[in-house]
Regions:
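Flexible metal-binding regulatory segments at protein termini and peripheral loops
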Residues: 1-77
């Protein structure tokens, strides 16, 4: 099952910061893609990546998650 997770991120105010978050998310098992922009990220994963793992990766990069939610679930092809 493919899951799209939307995340609002506090303090991520530059392209450099977005790259740091992108790099941190790349280390989370199950993440297929991550579109990280200033203040937010849209993550597609196979369902193995938990909210706790996603939040942990973002916090490890030095930022705080203010909102996280799953937007849609699609079968993996």
């Amino acid at each position: 099952m493919r899951v799209t997770t939307s995340v609002a991120i506090d303090g991520m105010l530059s392209v450099h910061a977005a790259h740091a978050v992108y790099t941190a998310l790349a280390g989370v098992d199950g993440i297929i893609t991550a579109d990280v922009k200033v203040g937010r990220a849209t993550i597609e994963h196979d369902g193995r990546a938990t909210h706790e793992q996603i939040i942990g990766a973002i916090e490890l990069a030095g930022y705080r998650v203010t909102e996280i939610r799953d937007e849609r679930r699609l079968p993996l092809l």
